[in-house]
Amino acid sequence: MPKVTVYNQTGSQVGEIELAEAIFGIEPNEAVLFEAVVMQRASLRQGTHKVKNRSEVSGGGRKPWRQKGTGRARQGSIRSPQWRGGGTVFGPTPRSYAYKLPKKVRRLAIKSALATKVVENNIVVLEDLVLNAPKTKDMVAVLKGLAVEKKALIVTADVNEAVELSARNIPGVTVITADGVNVLDVLHHDKLIMTKAAVEKVEEVLA
């Protein structure tokens, strides 16, 4: 079982915690991580693209000129795709790009993302994270005590409004709950900061 140092809010070591081998100690599966990231990014696409086809563009319904006798190519409508201002054929229409990987694959991807942070030594476990009031400077002090200078993902066991409000104005810092742990957020941030309660909750969900 991988062991990680536990810190308090001031950055002092207060002990160690053994992380679940089946979650934090597995060999990261890069192929599954790739598939999970592609899936998440696809679901973030708006899909609001739209062009008009020949039934939607403006223009008359009458035949531009008679069929025979003019010497010109026969035409049936000025809304045909070969005309300037005509409709588009097989153009993009509004659609959802979201899709889901199998549940086992999604769970393996999250485990692989968490294990990656352990391998890189980029996971920090806090004994607890308690802020009396939403103040950005208090959160900055916590991060400074933990020597976190890059992008950080803070995972709490439950919704903590004071923590969320204190971190939202700090560039590169994101706060989520243990239920919302996902591959894209974990990999996007350099440091993963979890409370002990959050670790226990994640292990309970992914066990």
From Swiss-Prot:
**A cellular component annotation (GO) from this entry:** ribonucleoprotein complex
MF term (GO), any:
structural constituent of ribosome
Q: Which InterPro entries match?
A: Ribosomal_uL4, Ribosomal_uL4-like, Ribosomal_uL4_dom_sf
Q: Where is this region: Disordered?
A: 48-89
Provide the GO biological process annotations: translation
Its keywords, alphabetically, are:
Ribonucleoprotein, Ribosomal protein, RNA-binding, rRNA-binding
Top-rank taxon of the source lineage equals Bacteria
| Keyword Ribonucleoprotein in annotation | yes
Q: Which family does it belong to?
A: Belongs to the universal ribosomal protein uL4 family.
Function, in words: One of the primary rRNA binding proteins, this protein initially binds near the 5'-end of the 23S rRNA. It is important during the early stages of 50S assembly. It makes multiple contacts with different domains of the 23S rRNA in the assembled 50S subunit and ribosome. Forms part of the polypeptide exit tunnel.
According to the record's subunit comment, the protein's assembly and interactions are: Part of the 50S ribosomal subunit.
From the Swiss-Prot or TrEMBL record, give the protein name: Large ribosomal subunit protein uL4
**Annotated organism of origin:** Bacillus cytotoxicus (strain DSM 22905 / CIP 110041 / 391-98 / NVH 391-98)
